[in-house]
Amino acid sequence: MDVLYSLSKTLKDARDKIVEGTLYSNVSDLIQQFNQMIITMNGNEFQTGGIGNLPIRNWNFDFGLLGTTLLNLDANYVETARNTIDYFVDFVDNVCMDEMVRESQRNGIAPQSDSLRKLSGIKFKRINFDNSSEYIENWNLQNRRQRTGFTFHKPNIFPYSASFTLNRSQPAHDNLMGTMWLNAGSEIQVAGFDYSCAINAPANIQQFEHIVQLRRVLTTATITLLPDAERFSFPRVINSADGATTWYFNPVILRPNNVEVEFLLNGQIINTYQARFGTIIARNFDTIRLSFQLMRPPNMTPAVAALFPNAQPFEHHATVGLTLRIESAVCESVLADASKTMLANVTSVRQEYAIPVGPVFPPGMNWTDLITNYSPSREDNLQRVFTVASIRSMLVK
């Protein structure tokens, strides 16, 4: 894997810097590295593809070295280099695709394609000169079963979940109280509602709670907490739990009271915030507990009092909500996130070449399914294919 990364890094630098008019002295070190790559690869044969509709391709390496010059690189020099670069880039691209479409239930962190296994041989280590990639660093750590750490921006840690619970209901669905939520990606939105605006609740206060368990532990997380849930701020028709009917939700938004968010690890509270909004942090956690209250306004203007009558019918439904968004965090496991295209890269290649469903990944690389059942086997395979996708993205956008 590290050899594949170094190949890609060398080719990217060569493609960017070996251009007509450049002083040879400015790229002499790169050309020496480029020539070392050619020397190491010459005389070797590889085969890629042969799974799904990914075609079988044979690769043979027999290229001349780039020479030295005292002056600028001319058009002939650059054209010779380009022909070599293009072949090598095509080879790396196909090795990456061949690796990204394969999976294994055992030792899925190790190379799975014949071509990448061959590149792992000792003689190709002479190519290796750069392991600065976060993915390569973590792949080497995971391969040795040592602790890894990925930094993510808006990590997709929450499987998609959208539902509701009713703490008070009737067959007519005309005086409901409960919570509804939408968890997806890096965001939780939860709303508590009471059609009667807590008129019969103790002290005219309704208490709500929402608990979310993560599939992986996050550390050093930067989080945004807002006293609102905008996705639940407009009227909607909702299917009943048994699917037998529908009920109408017409929210009027109030500010939540006594808001508390707790971050827990193995059942122990690590961080707690009370009535604090905006940016907060959490050291390490695998569970988030949100609690908040809906308080009936003690003083209301006639217009507000008309929204919340003392008896039915309740045409407007008092609602309070919270939004929690994980902006960035560190995780030992690889995840999809907002700043990287690894999941899309892997999924698109598997779709384009009609790769059959294997023993590890769900059909279509469904992320909700994958993260909901994030087994060690899936973790190993996902880290490997994401590492390869990061290498491919250096050369192929």
Swiss-Prot record:
GO MF term list: host cell surface receptor binding; metal ion binding; structural molecule activity
PTM annotation: The N-terminus is blocked.
Principal subcellular localisation of the protein: virion
Keywords on record: Calcium, Capsid protein, Intermediate capsid protein, Metal-binding, Ubl conjugation, Virion, Zinc
Sequence positions that bind Ca(2+): N266, D286
Keyword Calcium on entry: yes
Cellular compartments annotated: Virion
Gene Ontology BP, a term: fusion of virus membrane with host plasma membrane
Cellular component terms per the entry's GO annotation: T=13 icosahedral viral capsid; viral envelope; viral intermediate capsid
A Pfam family reported for this protein in Swiss-Prot or TrEMBL: Rota_Capsid_VP6
Region (Interaction with the inner capsid protein VP2): 62-73
Domain of life: Viruses
Keyword Calcium included in the entry's annotation: yes
Sequence positions that bind Zn(2+): H153
Subunit structure: Homotrimer. Interacts with the inner capsid protein VP2. Interacts with the outer capsid glycoprotein VP7. Interacts with the outer capsid protein VP5*.
Family in the record: Belongs to the rotavirus VP6 family.
Additional comment: The VP6 trimer contains a zinc ion located at the center of the molecule. The zinc ion is not essential for either trimerization or transcription activity of the DLP. Zinc-depleted VP6 has an increased sensitivity to proteases.
Record's function text: Intermediate capsid protein that self assembles to form an icosahedral capsid with a T=13 symmetry, which consists of 230 trimers of VP6, with channels at each of its five-fold vertices. This capsid constitutes the middle concentric layer of the viral mature particle. The innermost VP2 capsid and the intermediate VP6 capsid remain intact following cell entry to protect the dsRNA from degradation and to prevent unfavorable antiviral responses in the host cell during all the replication cycle of the virus.
Designated name of the protein: Intermediate capsid protein VP6
